């Protein structure tokens, strides 16, 4: 591309300062209230998911994509699909928190301990997040209580 950079297999996209600066600009622009455009995370050219190091780095990158507000991820190889789909599913804990936040949005209290008991659900600040979680739950599904994405991508040997 423009900067003559190609990622090495030891790094995820967030380890590159130029890429993270661009990603930040895209998110800040497209995630504004008046636009609220869902943004798919960028592609990773590494697809040998039989290599545990590459697979774990890919998972880390998808987790960071989600943390930064991306929805889904562009895939270039069939071996990437199962991992992206598994990590796109909504955890039971997030689903329960989102339901609680939406249900209590107009509450006089404003904040309550989450159903898991380890964090606070702030109704006004987390409302937009909760709506997004509910939409994604409808699309990708919700994991059962006590189950995480690893159950969906266990090796099929």
Question: Whereabouts are the PLM-identified features?
Answer:
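Expand to "…catalyze enediolate/carbanion chemistry for C-C bond making/breaking, isomerization
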Residues: 1-157
